[in-house]
Amino acid sequence: MLSPTNSTSKTAPVPPRDSSKPVLISEEPRNQLLQKVARTALAVLLVVVTLGLILLFYSFSDLQSFPWCCQTHPSTKEQPTISIPVPLPSPPLAVPRPSTPPPPVISRPSTPSAPKPSTPPPLLPKAPKPVKTQEDLLPLVPEQVFVEMYEDMARRQTIEALVPAWDSDIIFKCLCYFHTLYPGLIPLETFPPATIFNFKQKIISILEDKKAVLRGEPIKGPLPICCSKENYRRHLQRTTLLPVFMWYHPTPKTLSDTMQTMKQLAIKGSVGASHWLLVIVDIQARRLVYFDSLYNYVMPPENMKKELQSFAQQLDQVYPAYDSKKFSVKIAAKEVIQRGSGSSCGAWCCQFLHWYLKDPLTDALNDLPVDSVERHENLASFVQACEAAVQDLPELSWPEA
Protein backbone atom coordinates (compact mmCIF):
# COMPACT_ATOMS: atom_id res chain seq x y z
CA MET A 1 0.00 0.00 0.00
CA LEU A 2 1.38 3.40 -1.02
CA SER A 3 1.94 6.28 1.31
CA PRO A 4 -0.16 9.39 0.73
CA THR A 5 2.91 11.59 0.49
CA ASN A 6 4.67 12.30 -2.80
CA SER A 7 7.77 10.29 -3.34
CA THR A 8 9.47 13.16 -5.06
CA SER A 9 9.29 15.26 -1.94
CA LYS A 10 11.29 12.87 0.02
CA THR A 11 14.87 13.86 0.82
CA ALA A 12 17.53 11.43 0.19
CA PRO A 13 19.32 10.29 3.30
CA VAL A 14 22.76 11.78 3.89
CA PRO A 15 25.37 9.16 3.87
CA PRO A 16 27.67 9.06 6.91
CA ARG A 17 30.91 10.98 6.65
CA ASP A 18 33.88 8.86 6.21
CA SER A 19 36.55 10.01 8.64
CA SER A 20 39.22 8.22 6.72
CA LYS A 21 39.12 10.72 3.85
CA PRO A 22 41.93 13.32 3.98
CA VAL A 23 41.17 16.94 4.87
CA LEU A 24 42.51 19.64 2.57
CA ILE A 25 44.35 21.56 5.37
CA SER A 26 45.22 19.56 8.42
CA GLU A 27 45.45 20.95 11.96
CA GLU A 28 49.26 20.48 12.40
CA PRO A 29 50.43 22.56 9.41
CA ARG A 30 48.00 25.24 10.46
CA ASN A 31 49.65 25.47 13.90
CA GLN A 32 53.12 25.66 12.35
CA LEU A 33 52.00 28.49 10.12
CA LEU A 34 50.63 30.41 13.09
CA GLN A 35 53.93 29.96 14.97
CA LYS A 36 55.95 31.32 12.04
CA VAL A 37 53.69 34.34 11.76
CA ALA A 38 53.99 34.98 15.50
CA ARG A 39 57.79 34.73 15.37
CA THR A 40 57.98 37.13 12.46
CA ALA A 41 55.74 39.61 14.23
CA LEU A 42 57.80 39.32 17.41
CA ALA A 43 61.05 39.93 15.49
CA VAL A 44 59.59 42.99 13.80
CA LEU A 45 58.39 44.26 17.17
CA LEU A 46 61.86 43.81 18.70
CA VAL A 47 63.46 45.68 15.80
CA VAL A 48 61.02 48.54 16.22
CA VAL A 49 61.61 48.66 19.98
CA THR A 50 65.39 48.62 19.45
CA LEU A 51 65.22 51.47 16.97
CA GLY A 52 63.02 53.37 19.33
CA LEU A 53 65.50 52.95 22.16
CA ILE A 54 68.32 54.09 19.89
CA LEU A 55 66.35 57.19 18.97
CA LEU A 56 65.73 57.87 22.65
CA PHE A 57 69.37 57.64 23.71
CA TYR A 58 70.98 59.31 20.68
CA SER A 59 70.29 62.70 19.23
CA PHE A 60 69.99 63.34 15.54
CA SER A 61 73.54 64.69 15.28
CA ASP A 62 74.81 61.48 16.87
CA LEU A 63 72.92 59.40 14.36
CA GLN A 64 74.53 61.30 11.50
CA SER A 65 77.97 60.23 12.71
CA PHE A 66 77.16 56.58 12.19
CA PRO A 67 78.62 55.15 8.96
CA TRP A 68 75.33 53.70 7.81
CA CYS A 69 73.53 57.02 7.99
CA CYS A 70 73.01 58.90 4.71
CA GLN A 71 74.81 62.20 4.38
CA THR A 72 72.88 65.29 3.36
CA HIS A 73 73.48 66.68 -0.16
CA PRO A 74 73.14 70.28 -1.24
CA SER A 75 69.80 71.13 -2.74
CA THR A 76 71.34 72.92 -5.73
CA LYS A 77 72.94 70.75 -8.32
CA GLU A 78 76.31 71.78 -9.68
CA GLN A 79 76.13 73.01 -13.25
CA PRO A 80 78.41 71.08 -15.56
CA THR A 81 81.21 73.18 -17.02
CA ILE A 82 81.94 72.96 -20.75
CA SER A 83 85.64 73.32 -21.54
CA ILE A 84 86.42 74.76 -25.05
CA PRO A 85 89.96 74.09 -26.23
CA VAL A 86 91.81 77.33 -27.01
CA PRO A 87 94.75 77.13 -29.43
CA LEU A 88 98.06 78.33 -28.05
CA PRO A 89 99.53 81.45 -29.83
CA SER A 90 102.66 80.98 -31.86
CA PRO A 91 105.82 82.56 -30.49
CA PRO A 92 106.76 85.96 -32.06
CA LEU A 93 109.58 86.29 -34.51
CA ALA A 94 112.89 87.33 -32.96
CA VAL A 95 114.04 90.80 -34.28
CA PRO A 96 117.66 91.72 -33.49
CA ARG A 97 118.04 94.89 -31.49
CA PRO A 98 121.14 96.89 -30.55
CA SER A 99 122.51 95.93 -27.19
CA THR A 100 122.24 98.58 -24.54
CA PRO A 101 124.52 98.72 -21.55
CA PRO A 102 122.99 97.72 -18.26
CA PRO A 103 121.92 100.60 -16.08
CA PRO A 104 124.37 101.58 -13.39
CA VAL A 105 123.74 100.18 -9.99
CA ILE A 106 123.17 102.96 -7.50
CA SER A 107 124.03 101.91 -3.98
CA ARG A 108 121.77 103.39 -1.39
CA PRO A 109 122.62 103.62 2.26
CA SER A 110 120.98 100.81 4.01
CA THR A 111 118.43 101.93 6.52
CA PRO A 112 118.62 100.14 9.77
CA SER A 113 115.78 97.76 10.09
CA ALA A 114 113.54 98.10 13.05
CA PRO A 115 114.63 95.86 15.87
CA LYS A 116 112.54 92.80 16.25
CA PRO A 117 110.68 92.60 19.47
CA SER A 118 112.63 90.46 21.80
CA THR A 119 110.77 87.46 23.04
CA PRO A 120 110.75 87.16 26.82
CA PRO A 121 112.78 84.31 28.19
CA PRO A 122 110.77 81.28 29.15
CA LEU A 123 109.62 81.31 32.74
CA LEU A 124 111.44 78.83 34.85
CA PRO A 125 109.29 76.59 37.03
CA LYS A 126 109.12 77.77 40.60
CA ALA A 127 111.04 75.71 43.05
CA PRO A 128 108.79 73.91 45.53
CA LYS A 129 108.63 75.48 48.93
CA PRO A 130 110.60 73.50 51.48
CA VAL A 131 108.37 71.64 53.89
CA LYS A 132 109.26 72.53 57.45
CA THR A 133 109.46 69.58 59.77
CA GLN A 134 108.98 69.62 63.51
CA GLU A 135 112.75 69.77 63.99
CA ASP A 136 112.94 72.91 61.80
CA LEU A 137 110.20 74.60 63.82
CA LEU A 138 112.04 74.04 67.09
CA PRO A 139 114.46 76.80 68.01
CA LEU A 140 118.11 76.06 67.67
CA VAL A 141 119.69 75.25 71.00
CA PRO A 142 123.14 76.74 71.42
CA GLU A 143 125.96 74.35 72.06
CA GLN A 144 126.63 76.02 75.40
CA VAL A 145 123.24 74.85 76.65
CA PHE A 146 124.16 71.22 76.05
CA VAL A 147 127.45 71.75 77.80
CA GLU A 148 125.69 73.20 80.83
CA MET A 149 123.18 70.34 80.85
CA TYR A 150 125.99 67.79 80.81
CA GLU A 151 127.83 69.59 83.59
CA ASP A 152 124.64 69.75 85.66
CA MET A 153 124.05 66.00 85.23
CA ALA A 154 127.63 65.24 86.22
CA ARG A 155 127.30 67.56 89.24
CA ARG A 156 124.12 65.82 90.38
CA GLN A 157 125.70 62.39 90.11
CA THR A 158 128.65 63.59 92.16
CA ILE A 159 126.40 65.04 94.87
CA GLU A 160 124.21 61.93 95.05
CA ALA A 161 127.33 59.84 95.54
CA LEU A 162 128.56 62.17 98.31
CA VAL A 163 125.35 62.34 100.37
CA PRO A 164 122.94 59.39 100.33
CA ALA A 165 119.29 59.65 101.30
CA TRP A 166 118.55 59.36 105.02
CA ASP A 167 115.49 57.46 106.19
CA SER A 168 113.64 57.71 109.52
CA ASP A 169 115.86 55.12 111.24
CA ILE A 170 119.10 57.02 110.60
CA ILE A 171 117.48 60.32 111.61
CA PHE A 172 116.31 58.83 114.94
CA LYS A 173 119.79 57.45 115.65
CA CYS A 174 121.23 60.86 114.87
CA LEU A 175 118.83 62.42 117.42
CA CYS A 176 119.91 59.87 120.02
CA TYR A 177 123.53 60.83 119.33
CA PHE A 178 122.71 64.54 119.71
CA HIS A 179 121.06 63.78 123.07
CA THR A 180 124.35 62.42 124.37
CA LEU A 181 125.96 65.76 123.42
CA TYR A 182 123.08 68.02 124.54
CA PRO A 183 120.91 66.37 127.22
CA GLY A 184 118.26 69.08 126.88
CA LEU A 185 117.22 67.62 123.50
CA ILE A 186 114.56 64.90 123.56
CA PRO A 187 115.07 62.29 120.80
CA LEU A 188 111.54 62.11 119.46
CA GLU A 189 110.75 59.06 117.40
CA THR A 190 110.36 59.41 113.66
CA PHE A 191 108.28 56.27 113.10
CA PRO A 192 105.76 57.31 112.15
CA PRO A 193 107.01 60.85 111.72
CA ALA A 194 104.90 63.96 112.04
CA THR A 195 103.30 65.45 108.95
CA ILE A 196 102.14 68.88 107.89
CA PHE A 197 98.64 67.83 108.99
CA ASN A 198 99.38 66.74 112.59
CA PHE A 199 102.67 68.32 113.72
CA LYS A 200 100.83 71.00 115.73
CA GLN A 201 98.78 68.41 117.65
CA LYS A 202 101.93 66.41 118.33
CA ILE A 203 103.78 69.43 119.77
CA ILE A 204 100.81 70.40 121.94
CA SER A 205 100.49 66.81 123.24
CA ILE A 206 104.18 66.70 124.25
CA LEU A 207 103.96 70.07 126.04
CA GLU A 208 100.82 68.95 127.87
CA ASP A 209 102.63 65.80 129.03
CA LYS A 210 105.61 67.89 130.15
CA LYS A 211 103.33 70.06 132.29
CA ALA A 212 101.77 66.91 133.75
CA VAL A 213 105.19 65.49 134.64
CA LEU A 214 106.26 68.74 136.30
CA ARG A 215 103.09 68.66 138.39
CA GLY A 216 103.57 65.00 139.23
CA GLU A 217 100.50 63.95 137.28
CA PRO A 218 100.19 61.00 134.88
CA ILE A 219 100.76 61.75 131.24
CA LYS A 220 97.80 61.58 128.87
CA GLY A 221 99.52 61.39 125.51
CA PRO A 222 100.70 58.22 123.75
CA LEU A 223 103.93 56.60 124.91
CA PRO A 224 106.84 56.19 122.49
CA ILE A 225 107.27 52.74 120.97
CA CYS A 226 110.92 52.25 121.99
CA CYS A 227 110.95 53.97 125.38
CA SER A 228 109.73 52.90 128.78
CA LYS A 229 107.21 55.02 130.67
CA GLU A 230 109.63 56.03 133.43
CA ASN A 231 112.42 56.86 131.02
CA TYR A 232 110.02 58.94 128.94
CA ARG A 233 108.89 60.90 132.02
CA ARG A 234 112.52 61.69 132.87
CA HIS A 235 113.13 62.92 129.30
CA LEU A 236 110.05 65.15 129.48
CA GLN A 237 111.14 66.61 132.81
CA ARG A 238 114.62 67.58 131.58
CA THR A 239 113.94 68.54 127.98
CA THR A 240 114.17 72.14 126.80
CA LEU A 241 114.11 71.55 123.03
CA LEU A 242 111.76 69.51 120.82
CA PRO A 243 113.13 68.54 117.36
CA VAL A 244 110.02 67.72 115.29
CA PHE A 245 110.84 66.10 111.93
CA MET A 246 108.01 66.28 109.40
CA TRP A 247 107.59 63.99 106.39
CA TYR A 248 105.96 65.76 103.45
CA HIS A 249 104.68 64.67 100.03
CA PRO A 250 102.94 67.11 97.66
CA THR A 251 100.33 64.65 96.34
CA PRO A 252 98.19 63.64 99.39
CA LYS A 253 95.85 66.25 100.82
CA THR A 254 94.83 64.52 104.06
CA LEU A 255 96.60 62.78 106.93
CA SER A 256 95.32 59.32 106.01
CA ASP A 257 96.39 59.74 102.38
CA THR A 258 99.83 60.90 103.54
CA MET A 259 100.27 57.80 105.69
CA GLN A 260 99.16 55.59 102.81
CA THR A 261 101.63 57.26 100.44
CA MET A 262 104.39 56.88 103.03
CA LYS A 263 103.64 53.17 103.32
CA GLN A 264 103.64 52.63 99.56
CA LEU A 265 106.99 54.37 99.10
CA ALA A 266 108.48 52.37 101.97
CA ILE A 267 107.39 49.11 100.30
CA LYS A 268 108.90 50.21 96.98
CA GLY A 269 112.10 51.38 98.67
CA SER A 270 111.88 54.75 96.91
CA VAL A 271 111.87 58.31 98.24
CA GLY A 272 109.78 59.63 95.35
CA ALA A 273 108.82 63.27 95.83
CA SER A 274 108.95 63.05 99.63
CA HIS A 275 110.77 65.68 101.66
CA TRP A 276 111.99 66.13 105.25
CA LEU A 277 111.21 69.34 107.16
CA LEU A 278 112.28 70.44 110.64
CA VAL A 279 110.48 72.48 113.29
CA ILE A 280 112.49 73.27 116.43
CA VAL A 281 110.49 74.16 119.53
CA ASP A 282 112.94 75.91 121.84
CA ILE A 283 111.05 75.92 125.15
CA GLN A 284 113.75 77.82 127.04
CA ALA A 285 114.18 80.55 124.40
CA ARG A 286 110.44 80.57 123.55
CA ARG A 287 111.17 80.25 119.84
CA LEU A 288 109.76 78.32 116.85
CA VAL A 289 112.35 77.73 114.12
CA TYR A 290 111.26 76.37 110.74
CA PHE A 291 113.83 74.87 108.35
CA ASP A 292 113.18 73.76 104.76
CA SER A 293 116.26 72.96 102.69
CA LEU A 294 114.17 73.53 99.54
CA TYR A 295 113.03 76.91 100.90
CA ASN A 296 109.44 76.88 99.57
CA TYR A 297 108.64 73.23 98.79
CA VAL A 298 105.60 73.11 101.08
CA MET A 299 104.40 76.70 100.77
CA PRO A 300 105.88 80.18 100.39
CA PRO A 301 107.92 81.19 103.47
CA GLU A 302 105.65 84.18 104.11
CA ASN A 303 102.60 81.92 104.36
CA MET A 304 104.42 79.46 106.60
CA LYS A 305 105.54 82.27 108.88
CA LYS A 306 101.95 83.51 109.29
CA GLU A 307 100.77 79.99 110.07
CA LEU A 308 103.51 79.46 112.66
CA GLN A 309 102.81 82.84 114.25
CA SER A 310 99.20 81.80 114.74
CA PHE A 311 100.41 78.51 116.20
CA ALA A 312 102.82 80.39 118.51
CA GLN A 313 99.89 82.28 120.01
CA GLN A 314 98.23 78.95 120.69
CA LEU A 315 101.38 77.65 122.42
CA ASP A 316 101.44 80.72 124.66
CA GLN A 317 98.16 79.53 126.09
CA VAL A 318 99.07 75.84 126.23
CA TYR A 319 102.49 76.32 127.82
CA PRO A 320 102.74 79.86 129.27
CA ALA A 321 106.04 81.20 130.59
CA TYR A 322 106.56 82.43 134.14
CA ASP A 323 107.70 85.80 132.83
CA SER A 324 104.86 85.93 130.23
CA LYS A 325 107.34 85.77 127.37
CA LYS A 326 105.75 84.97 124.02
CA PHE A 327 106.89 82.48 121.43
CA SER A 328 108.63 84.00 118.42
CA VAL A 329 108.91 82.57 114.90
CA LYS A 330 111.97 82.31 112.67
CA ILE A 331 112.27 81.05 109.09
CA ALA A 332 115.83 79.75 108.89
CA ALA A 333 116.44 79.18 105.15
CA LYS A 334 116.57 82.22 102.89
CA GLU A 335 117.26 80.26 99.71
CA VAL A 336 117.40 76.71 98.36
CA ILE A 337 120.08 74.96 100.39
CA GLN A 338 120.27 71.56 98.70
CA ARG A 339 120.89 72.77 95.16
CA GLY A 340 121.72 69.98 92.75
CA SER A 341 120.46 67.26 95.08
CA GLY A 342 117.06 65.68 95.50
CA SER A 343 117.64 63.32 98.41
CA SER A 344 119.86 65.13 100.93
CA CYS A 345 117.00 66.86 102.81
CA GLY A 346 117.23 64.56 105.86
CA ALA A 347 120.96 65.13 106.24
CA TRP A 348 120.51 68.90 105.88
CA CYS A 349 117.87 68.94 108.64
CA CYS A 350 120.24 67.13 111.00
CA GLN A 351 123.10 69.44 110.04
CA PHE A 352 121.03 72.54 110.79
CA LEU A 353 119.88 71.05 114.11
CA HIS A 354 123.51 70.42 115.05
CA TRP A 355 124.39 74.05 114.24
CA TYR A 356 121.45 75.28 116.31
CA LEU A 357 122.43 73.12 119.31
CA LYS A 358 125.90 74.64 119.27
CA ASP A 359 124.62 78.21 118.79
CA PRO A 360 120.87 79.05 118.74
CA LEU A 361 121.67 82.37 117.05
CA THR A 362 123.80 80.72 114.40
CA ASP A 363 124.16 82.19 110.93
CA ALA A 364 125.88 79.14 109.49
CA LEU A 365 123.52 79.09 106.51
CA ASN A 366 124.90 82.44 105.40
CA ASP A 367 128.43 81.04 105.33
CA LEU A 368 127.72 78.11 103.00
CA PRO A 369 129.88 77.79 99.87
CA VAL A 370 128.32 79.07 96.69
CA ASP A 371 129.33 76.01 94.69
CA SER A 372 126.83 73.20 95.24
CA VAL A 373 129.44 70.44 95.00
CA GLU A 374 131.67 72.09 97.60
CA ARG A 375 128.62 72.68 99.79
CA HIS A 376 127.69 69.00 99.72
CA GLU A 377 131.29 67.96 100.27
CA ASN A 378 131.11 69.76 103.62
CA LEU A 379 127.79 68.05 104.32
CA ALA A 380 129.32 64.69 103.43
CA SER A 381 131.93 65.16 106.18
CA PHE A 382 129.14 65.71 108.73
CA VAL A 383 127.22 62.66 107.42
CA GLN A 384 130.25 60.40 107.72
CA ALA A 385 130.91 61.59 111.29
CA CYS A 386 127.29 60.93 112.33
CA GLU A 387 127.15 57.50 110.70
CA ALA A 388 130.35 56.51 112.49
CA ALA A 389 129.02 57.80 115.85
CA VAL A 390 125.65 56.02 115.73
CA GLN A 391 127.17 52.61 115.07
CA ASP A 392 127.69 52.04 118.81
CA LEU A 393 124.15 53.10 119.75
CA PRO A 394 121.48 50.44 120.38
CA GLU A 395 119.08 49.74 117.57
CA LEU A 396 115.82 51.74 117.85
CA SER A 397 116.11 52.37 121.57
CA TRP A 398 115.90 55.62 123.52
CA PRO A 399 118.98 56.56 125.53
CA GLU A 400 118.54 56.65 129.28
CA ALA A 401 117.78 60.10 130.65
From Swiss-Prot:
* Catalytic residues identified in the record: H275, D292, C345
Q: Where in the cell is it found?
A: Secreted; Host cell; Membrane
Query: Disordered: where is this region?
Result: 1-24, 77-130
By what name is this protein known?
Deubiquitinase and deneddylase Dub1
Which lineage is the organism of this entry classified under, starting from the top rank? Bacteria, Pseudomonadati, Chlamydiota, Chlamydiia, Chlamydiales
In the UniProt record, the gene name given for this protein reads cdu1
Compositional bias annotation for Pro residues: 86-128
Biased segments, Polar residues type: 1-11
Q: Name one GO biological process term.
A: protein deubiquitination
Listed transmembrane segments:
40-60
Free-text function comment from the UniProt entry:
Effector proteins function to alter host cell physiology and promote bacterial survival in host tissues. This protease possesses deubiquitinating and deneddylating activities. Impairs ubiquitination and degradation of NF-kappa-B inhibitor alpha (NFKBIA), thereby preventing NF-kappa-B activation.
Domain of life of the native organism: Bacteria
Major localization class:
secreted
